[in-house]
Amino acid sequence: MGGVERILVSACLLGRRVRYDGGAKTSDDDLLARWRAEGRLVPFCPEVEGGLPVPRPPAEIEGGAGGAAVLAGEARILTPDGADVTEAFLSGARQALAAARSSGVRIAILKEGSPSCGSLRIYDGTHRGRTTPGQGVTTALLELNGVRVFGEDRVPDAARYLETLT
């Protein structure tokens, strides 16, 4: 795109119905809308790209251990009935990294709280609606590879960071 920074964005934030419950979490952020109109956004849902259906059971990282522990093989991602969906989440994270690399992405805006995309907090692994500080698997992999990740509630911070890249 000739010097225009591309931004990886959770597809659910752009209105795509890819969430576990079959819904979207469409953002009404003006900056995201502007970047979308400029063609900067690279929509991506790691859970769907990893092979999980829509809708699907919710999943959480056991013990709220965080994405880095999953990447290291020290934690799993489980549904409330105990089904292990770790491999699908890892596959989606690897595909997100590949999409970021192929698009020249150095910044991402992802859905906070998600076991894939959370950047500051994730659910604690008890399936009781409680959160804990931590990152999702995709966020952890992207950050390990130099892509800076922001939650959807930190778009102004992402914009400031974006200015340092250009």
State what each model feature region is.
Residues 15-21:
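Short N-terminal binding/cap micro-motifs at the start of the first secondary-structure element
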Residues 12, 111-114, 154:
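Short, well-ordered beta-to-alpha junction loops that form the rim of enzyme active sites
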Residues 17, 52-53, 116-119:
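Short catalytic/ligand-binding loop motif for oxyanion handling, primarily in non-cytosolic enzymes
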Residues 106:
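Short acidic/polar active-site loop segments enriched in Thr and Asp
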Residues 113, 117-139:
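Short Gly/Thr/Asp-enriched flexible loops that form oxyanion-binding sites at enzyme active sites
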Residues 25-76:
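Short, surface-exposed acidic-centric catalytic microdomains
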Residues 6-11, 43:
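Short, hydrophobic/glycine-enriched beta-strand segments
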Residues 2-3, 49, 59, 68-99, ...:
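Divalent-metal-activated hydrolytic enzyme cores
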